[in-house]
Amino acid sequence: MSVVGTPKSAEQIQQEWDTNPRWKDVTRTYSAEDVVALQGSVVEEHTLARRGAEVLWEQLHDLEWVNALGALTGNMAVQQVRAGLKAIYLSGWQVAGDANLSGHTYPDQSLYPANSVPQVVRRINNALQRADQIAKIEGDTSVENWLAPIVADGEAGFGGALNVYELQKALIAAGVAGSHWEDQLASEKKCGHLGGKVLIPTQQHIRTLTSARLAADVADVPTVVIARTDAEAATLITSDVDERDQPFITGERTREGFYRTKNGIEPCIARAKAYAPFADLIWMETGTPDLEAARQFSEAVKAEYPDQMLAYNCSPSFNWKKHLDDATIAKFQKELAAMGFKFQFITLAGFHALNYSMFDLAYGYAQNQMSAYVELQEREFAAEERGYTATKHQREVGAGYFDRIATTVDPNSSTTALTGSTEEGQFH
């Protein structure tokens, strides 16, 4: 009988946890025996997820910082990697707004089907794989790693610990490298820059993080787990049961039964310290781009956990020039990196790039017809000097790659797609 997929023994797993530097700062409340018990007799290999997680972990330690833009389509991710970015961010907000499986437009309130983000992860990985295949048959070595790691939004888990476990499983199966989980009540979940957020107790979020880690361990993938706290803005909490939350709870109740709690950086610090043993990175969601607040947060967390890596949302919800001058904006990410914010990302970059670029083209087209489109085409031609390739759209989506399949099957094929195409005739 084949031994492919045979799980590791509990002893092997425990040795890995004890000796691999990857796990030196990670606390698990379950045993290697628990993992083995949950694996069954065959463990499926998740190549893209494993590779992505390992690459992301290396980047976080080898690069000054890893920066990413939010993508909501496969082609967006391809252009990001072509342009030089090393990682991809996938925002639940963008999936809600324009990429979910229900086909509706939603605000960021966990209203879309829970398997939507894994589906977009799969779509992005498929697009990156196609770009890699095209590059290989063309002998194009300009991009070192087409399969850039994807960090995806697990939101508040769409329920309890079991929902988190299943969502993490689906993300890993789709090829995710890392996932983040926020400490909001899933049924009342809001975008970090909306009002009405309700926190869950600190211990309950530790269960979320533990469940996400357990799912990765059962899959035998070193997924990067990111803890997010919304305590900087949230003024409600479901319960006063956790002693760590009690110093911030005012004693007032709302008509829904929630407790009012003090928001600000102090509850964020308290929660970050509680989450640190269970998370590879910690993200404090903020309402403004504030370097001093970031420094205060970093120093407080690192005083107790000096090796703790942090993440920062350089959000489009900030009116950047209202808060910062040009010089501060230019050095913003570098200064964050010096504080330990190793993963920095613009969550909704894809939404804004897509909407503005199409509005700009459509406005010009409405006024000036073909002249507006030709201006876009000329900008594409000019961008080829910087590595842009999508001017040749047939090539970009793999017509040449599938011609190669056709001629491999039949070297004398007379039905290849690019031969005789307008692209071959006009774009060389």
From Swiss-Prot:
Catalytic activity: D-threo-isocitrate = glyoxylate + succinate
Superkingdom assignment: Bacteria
Effect of C191S: Adopts a conformation almost identical to the wild-type
Entries under InterPro entries matching the protein: Isocitrate_lyase, Isocitrate_lyase_ph_CS, Pyrv/PenolPyrv_kinase-like_dom, Pyrv_kinase-like_dom_sf
Binding annotation for substrate: S91, G92, W93, G192, H193, R228, N313, C314, S315, P316, S317, T347
Phenotypic effect of disruption: Cells lacking this gene show an attenuated bacterial persistence and virulence in immune-competent mice without affecting bacterial growth during the acute phase of infection.
Activity control, per UniProt: Inhibited by 3-nitropropionate (3-NP) and 3-bromopyruvate when M.tuberculosis grows on acetate, but not on glucose. Inhibition of ICL by 3-bromopyruvate is accomplished via dehalogenation of the inhibitor to form a covalent adduct with the active site Cys-191. Also inhibited by zinc and calcium ions.
SUPFAM superfamilies, per the entry: Phosphoenolpyruvate/pyruvate domain
Cofactor binding description: Can also use Mn(2+) ion.
Binding site for Mg(2+): D153
NCBIfam families for this protein: isocit_lyase, PRK15063.1
Role, per record: Involved in the persistence and virulence of M.tuberculosis. Catalyzes the reversible formation of succinate and glyoxylate from isocitrate, a key step of the glyoxylate cycle, which operates as an anaplerotic route for replenishing the tricarboxylic acid cycle during growth on fatty acid substrates. It could also catalyze the formation of pyruvate and succinate from 2-methylisocitrate, a key step in the methylcitrate cycle (propionate degradation route).
Note: Was identified as a natural substrate of the M.tuberculosis proteasome.
Protein name as annotated: Isocitrate lyase
Species classification: Bacteria, Bacillati, Actinomycetota, Actinomycetes, Mycobacteriales
Gene designation per UniProt: icl
